[in-house]
UniProtKB/Swiss-Prot annotation:
InterPro entries: AceGlu_kinase-like_sf, AcgluKinase_fam, ArgB, Asp/Glu/Uridylate_kinase, Glu/AcGlu_kinase, NAGK-C. Pfam families: AA_kinase (PF00696). Keywords: Amino-acid biosynthesis, Arginine biosynthesis, ATP-binding, Cytoplasm, Kinase, Nucleotide-binding, Transferase. Gene3D superfamilies: Acetylglutamate kinase-like (3.40.1160.10). Its main location: cytoplasm. Its EC number is 2.7.2.8. GO terms for cellular component: cytoplasm. The keyword Secreted does not apply. Substrate binds at G71, G72, R93, N198. The gene is argB. The record marks K36, K258 as: Transition state stabilizer. This is Acetylglutamate kinase.
Length: 301
């Protein structure tokens, strides 16, 4: 009697994982995914390598990833190194002309090219751009209003060169993705006045996802996702559920603007937005290609 081949358990699990991924690969082939990359995943070489490999794999199976990156901490370090003092109003950095130039240098000249290099080492072909290139993202100046502490009247606060996306011209991104390239986008845009404006990276990613009619928006963070009152991960959320949880103070702090970006994107036509833990190796692949997923998925009611 011939011996029966018993496959190694680990090999069998890998084969089952690939089999489980097949319907998702078929579903998303040819679709655009916008991935906001930042936090721990950006500062750790091992995490950066894992991220780059995930992005290259997505491209290899027919998905078109577009990477948007942040860089606030790195900008802060450079400003400090150059002896430039930062001014903050209600927790928001005031971006004067000098600060804007330094921010662009760090975002487009350093961080952006580092990510391009990581993707290149993983076998991909990446191109570093910003929202200024080909007027990819046009912005309007952010206007902030607060109550005057003296008389309680509204007053306008000038944050300098900080912008909010108002339009996306997708032609450059389409040209790059159709040529087999992976766009890596720095969160910088151009105003109607021709000036350069910094953009919040989450906001930039959300605007691009909407403008590119992306199937998915991923926001990589340093938390597991959105947690309930018992600190357990919420797998899916709708705008109405988010509103209820926010009113109950279950959702608070920095998670609120991230979820606002998710809601705006799905209301603008993005199929779903996902808040993911960038500290978890291959979290994007786990979220996409397994039934359980890895983060919090936001979809319409």
């Amino acid at each position: 009697m011939s011996a029966t081949y018993a496959p190694d358990r680990i090999l069998l699990e890998k084969a089952e994982t690939l089999s489980e991924a097949l319907p998702y690969i078929q579903r998303y082939a040819g679709k655009i995914f916008v991935v906001k990359y930042g936090g721990h995943a950006m500062g750790n070489p091992d995490a950066a390598q894992d991220f780059a490999e995930d992005i290259v794999l997505l491209k290899a199976i027919g998905i078109h990833p577009v990477v948007v990156h942040g860089g606030g901490p790195q900008i802060g370090k450079m400003l400090k190194a150059l002896g430039v003092e930062s001014q903050f109003i209600d927790g928001l950095r005031v971006t004067d002309n000098e600060t804007a130039k330094i921010a662009e240098m760090v975002l487009s000249g350093a961080i952006n090219k580092d990510i391009v290099s990581w993707i290149g080492r993983a076998g991909g072909r990446a191109v570093g751009i910003s929202g200024k290139d080909a007027k990819l993202v046009e912005v309007e100046k952010v206007k902030k209003i607060r109550k005057n502490s003296t008389d309680g009247q509204d007053e306008n606060i000038d944050l300098g060169f900080v912008g909010r996306p108002v339009s996306v011209d997708r032609r450059l991104i389409d040209t790059l993705t159709q040529s087999g390239m992976i766009p890596v986008v720095a969160p910088i845009g151009v105003g109607a006045d021709g000036e350069t404006y910094n953009i919040n990276a989450d906001t930039m990613a959300g605007a691009l996802a909407a403008g590119l009619e992306a199937a998915r928006l991923f926001l990589l963070t340093d938390v597991a996702g959105v947690l309930d009152a018992d600190k357990k991960l919420l797998r899916t959320l709708t705008p109405s559920q988010i509103d209820s949880l926010t009113k109950a103070d279950v959702i608070s702090g920095g998670m609120i603007p991230k979820l606002e970006t998710c809601i705006e994107s799905v209301k603008s036509g993005v199929d779903a937005a996902v808040i993911l833990d960038g500290r978890v190796p291959h979290s994007i692949l786990i979220e996409l290609f397994t039934e359980q997923g890895a983060g919090t998925l936001v979809k319409l009611d």
